[in-house]
Amino acid sequence: MLRVYIPGDAAVYRNYARAVRRAGAVPCFTDDPADCGCLLLPGGGDLSPMLYGQTDIACRGLDPARDALEMDLLNLFTSAHRPVLGAYRGMQSVNVFFGGTLVQDLPGHSSVHDSDRLHSVTAAPSLLRRLYGERCVVNSSHHQSIDRFGAGLEALQWAPDGTVEALRHRTLPILCVQWHPERLSLPGAADGQLLYDAFLSMAKL
């Protein structure tokens, strides 16, 4: 059975673990990541802007130890051509790992009164488009976004204001979304479990 490494506390990331189990895989928090076949980078605070050559003007919840861990994990999994799925911060980590930059503060996309915003996205031909159609509605609770793309990365979904909501690597098995597919689907919004099911099914091959 596919083992999916999730860096972090199992209690904090229980929604991710639930989605992985529902997709027929095993979430791993304390195992050796080298023994896992897939990496799932979850949401969280902002990455240090020093990683992409900027000074801090609007970052929140910086955690240099986590930054270093995720860069090491990405090096491990990409070197072995193992699948990587990123959500929210996970997508930003992937972009920075490949040399990209971030918008440090993006108005209009963060949560309101602890509730996710909902907005539409438009998808390029891809797995996401096959799952959700050319247009769908996703949740949104981020205040940073992709600015310059890292090497080998390309956009798959965009918000109406042009914000990149999903990306993939052209040659490596990497897929990331800026929204939160692990959260229970809200009425009228895309069912994120479909993404976990499809990506982890491909990762098992």
Each model region followed by its residue ranges:
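Active-site-proximal beta-strand elements of phosphoester/diester hydrolases
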Residues: 175-179
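Conserved SAM-binding loop
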Residues: 90
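N-terminal beta1-alpha1 cap of cysteine-dependent amidohydrolase-like domains
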Residues: 1-87, 95-103, 107-127, 131-137, ...
